[in-house]
Swiss-Prot record:
Gene: deoA
Record EC number: 2.4.2.4
Biological processes annotated in GO: pyrimidine nucleobase metabolic process; thymidine metabolic process
Organism: Burkholderia orbicola (strain MC0-3)
Recorded GO CC terms: cytosol
Record-stated family: Belongs to the thymidine/pyrimidine-nucleoside phosphorylase family.
Protein name stated in the entry: Thymidine phosphorylase
Gene3D superfamilies for the chain: Nucleoside phosphorylase/phosphoribosyltransferase catalytic domain, Pyrimidine nucleoside phosphorylase-like, C-terminal domain, Transferase, Pyrimidine Nucleoside Phosphorylase, Chain C
Species classification: Bacteria, Pseudomonadati, Pseudomonadota, Betaproteobacteria, Burkholderiales
Length: 438
């Protein structure tokens, strides 16, 4: 007979946990026989005594198996089922370009994404800025879109890794969110439930990153690579910079417009392009669609230049209920804020540092993000034309523009931006890509 308290006691005392015990505990989490207090006690025991790689794999697989696990084999897809996951940040709109780009190169991308919480933006919130786009379609519509278009970006259904949802909610209120072992299991259980052959992780580093230090970001990346591969899914990770907004804008409709400009070739900001190409290329190599990174980049550039990637995005939008002319007339469909004002620099100088987290929180304060899961968001608000680290700004020139619902909100956000930028005599842009793991 399985006793949750004895299982918890073993971890409390630093003893190893076996796969059967982990599976039984997670089954209890799912069916409710393990109490909230017991989940909290387990999470705290893990926080202090950690999990070995084998234990992390066992927890991840148990959480995966707590609900539906998608199987794409019956559809006879002509390519690998692959995906990218980011630890989140500000202006991180990569998914909206990467999915269609990889699909145009022969991959199948069933991307199950989340909403934003805290200072980070969520891919689902960005897609919610597209009128009619169904971020929670039924499984048949999801599978059909992946099969016919090659990419579908949707939200997590209640039946995918339900144990993770309950465990995370308890971790969130018991000061155990920071456990790398449990972050790893949370991310990978959902990706494994999506039936992936391969995954590339984008782990952010810097002032706008989820993890507090570069060392912690690297630790998380290594854990995800080890556990993902241990669970039978080919997994690699790239550490990328989040010391400033990745795109020159932050906010839901603004970022969708940025993604459309990127796919159609109107504008491809250098930092955003570097990260998008690096992650997309690694996915093609992971999925066996390219010999090496150089070959992958060649294929991806062709997908962009030919319009094939843009066409995949347009088809995905239509398949999930959005407008057929979104790429041709984005201004017709994407909400525009009532107030748009520049934020003049208080002095001349070179941008030395940006408090990226503060920029993300400014978007939340405007109404473009949420502080509680149930909060509604305003997709029109945000920041645009943000100055980059290393860029010279003259006094009075804009550090960026605020898109707000009223003058008072605009003034508050403008003040946050001014405080978030540090100008000096010299400044050097940080690298966009740090290193690959796995």
């Amino acid at each position: 007979m399985f006793l949750p308290q004895e299982f918890i006691r073993r971890k409390r005392d630093g003893q190893p946990l076996d796969r059967d015990g982990m599976a039984a505990f997670v089954r209890g989490v799912t069916d409710g026989s393990v109490t909230e207090g017991q989940v909290a006690a387990f999470a705290m025991a893990v926080y202090f005594n950690d999990l070995s790689t084998d234990e992390r794999v066992a927890l991840t697989l148990a959480q995966r198996d707590s609900g539906d696990v998608l199987d794409w084999r019956a559809l006879g897809l002509g390519g690998p089922v692959i995906d990218k996951h980011s630890t989140g940040g500000v202006g991180d709109v990569v998914s909206l370009m990467l999915g269609p780009m990889v699909a145009a190169c022969g991959g199948y991308v069933p991307m199950i994404s989340g909403r934003g919480l805290g200072h980070t933006g969520g891919t689902l919130d960005k897609l919610s800025a597209i009128p009619g786009y169904d971020v929670m379609p039924d499984t048949d519509a999801f599978r059909r879109t992946v099969r016919e278009v090659g990419v579908a970006i949707i939200g997590q259904t209640a039946r995918l890794a339900p144990a993770d949802k309950r465990i995370y909610a308890i971790r969130d209120v018991t000061a155990t969110v920071e456990s790398v072992a449990m972050i790893t299991a949370s991310i990978l259980s959902k990706k494994l439930a999506a039936g992936l052959d391969g995954l590339v992780m984008d782990v952010k580093v810097g002032s706008g990153a989820f993890m507090p230090t570069a060392e912690k970001s690297a630790e998380l990346a290594r854990s995800i690579v080890d556990v993902g591969n241990g669970a039978g899914m080919k997994t690699t990770a790239i550490l990328t910079d989040m010391n400033q907004s990745l795109a020159p804008c932050a906010g839901n409709a603004l970022e969708v417009a940025c993604a459309i400009d990127y796919l159609t070739g109107k504008s491809r900001p250098a930092r955003l392009h570097d990260v998008t190409m690096a992650l997309s290329a690694e996915l093609l190599v992971t999925g066996g669609l390219a010999r090496d990174a150089a070959h992958a980049r060649e294929k991806l550039q062709q997908a962009l230049d030919s319009g094939a990637a843009a066409e995949r995005f347009a088809r995905m939008v239509v398949a999930l209920g959005g407008p057929a002319d979104l790429l041709d007339a984005p201004a017709r469909h994407l909400a525009r804020a009532a107030v748009i004002v520049p934020v003049p620099a208080p002095a001349s100088g070179v941008v030395q540092r940006v408090d990226c987290r503060a920029l993300g929180l400014a978007v939340v304060a405007l109404g473009g993000g949420r502080t509680r899961a149930e909060d509604a968001i305003d997709v029109s608000v945000g920041l645009s034309a943000l100055a980059e680290i290393g860029q010279r700004i003259e006094s009075g020139e804009p550090l960026g523009f605020v898109h707000a619902r009223d003058e008072a909100a605009a003034a508050h956000a403008a003040d946050a931006i001014r405080r978030g930028y540090v100008l000096g005599d010299t400044g050097e842009a940080p690298p966009t890509l740090y290193r690959q793991i796995g």
